[in-house]
Amino acid sequence: MKKTIKVKKFIEGLQLTPIYLGDQKTLNIHSSDLNRPGLQLSGFFEYFSMDRVQLFGKGEIEYLKSLDPAVRQERLETYFSYPIPCVIISRDQYPDEQIIEVARKYDVPLFLSSLDTMKISNLVSIF
């Protein structure tokens, strides 16, 4: 599945709150599957499904908080440097400024969802 979705439709259809959009009017989604980037945030990129919508749940956010700030910066820089379509953060876990700045730097749309991780995952997969 490869499709282009208007950002506005994506936001409205999934009831997302945009944190950073950049100039993008569309998202190129290559799969209805999602990627939970725990392995990538730990530094493993060998089998990274970068063409999927990326979903940060409580585990990913808490893991990032546990890292030394310099290590966290390096991991975020590496992760966001890949051509990922967008990142959704579940459970209204508003990201810290470091995540927002790196998303801006690499022009990766960043969204917030009030839903728990499983619910937003299911909605994205059928969207």
Q: Model-found features: residue ranges?
A:
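Feature captures the catalytic cores and cofactor-binding loops of soluble hydro-lyases/lyases
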Residues: 44-55, 59-127
